[in-house]
A protein has these predicted regions:
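Hydrophobic alpha-helical membrane-association signature
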Residues: 27-31, 80, 107, 141
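General small-molecule cofactor/ligand-binding pocket signal
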Residues: 47-49, 98-103, 154
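Small/aliphatic-rich secondary-structure junction motif
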Residues: 11-70, 93, 148-149, 158-161, ...
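A short acidic, glycine-rich active-site loop
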Residues: 68-82
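Glycine-rich, Arg-bearing micro-motifs that act as flexible, cationic patches
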Residues: 9, 122-148, 162
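Short beta-strand elements of ligand-binding domains
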Residues: 1-4, 153-157
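Structural beta-alpha unit
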Residues: 89-125, 130-132, 160-170
Length: 170
């Protein structure tokens, strides 16, 4: 827990990545489950955010002309929005749209900025499971975010089944 005094969180952020493989969607659902538990226990306000950027944005921005880039960028944005909406539609609890954010950029950049600006007390996020001792506890993105936020962070490790499924999908 970050901070000088111990208190219940008032603002909780579920940082999820609902797109792509079924294992990502399952991990995002687990993160939401944990965030909802914290919110139920603490009576905090829940926010949900996902960071997105077009695949290969760094390279393609310099290669595509403006019209192609804008179309590619918009398609990626629509896909990210659809993935997020689909996951939230499966949930039994309705979340006000003003507490759901689709943040442009990488998770390592966009999530800390949003958390700090919104005065988030607790971020609930997943890990990818890196190698080594630190990797046993955190993923690279979680490590980067921890260094940039004033919030406490609850990391949810990948389900063993999800980890094997992700490796098989690669």
């Amino acid at each position: 827990v970050v901070g000088e005094e111990s208190r219940l969180p008032e603002q909780v952020l579920a940082a999820i990545d609902p797109g792509g493989a079924p294992s990502r969607r399952a991990a995002a659902s687990r993160i939401l489950d944990w965030a909802e538990r914290v919110v139920d226990w603490s009576e905090a306000e829940l926010h949900v955010a996902t960071a997105w950027q077009p695949t290969g944005a760094e390279v393609l921005r310099g290669v595509l002309d403006d019209a192609e880039w804008n179309a590619y960028h918009e398609e990626a944005h629509q896909r990210a929005a659809a993935d997020l909406d689909a996951l939230l539609a499966e949930r039994s609890s309705a979340l006000p749209r003003d507490r759901v954010r689709l943040l442009p950029g990488t998770a390592a950049d966009a999530l800390p900025a949003f958390a700090n600006e919104s005065r988030i007390d607790l971020i609930v996020m997943g890990t990818r499971g890196r190698e080594g001792r630190v990797g046993d506890l955190l993923g690279e993105t979680a490590e980067t975010i921890i260094r940039q936020v004033r919030s406490s962070i609850l990391t949810i490790p990948p389900d063993t089944h999800e980890t094997h499924e992700t490796e098989a999908e690669s």
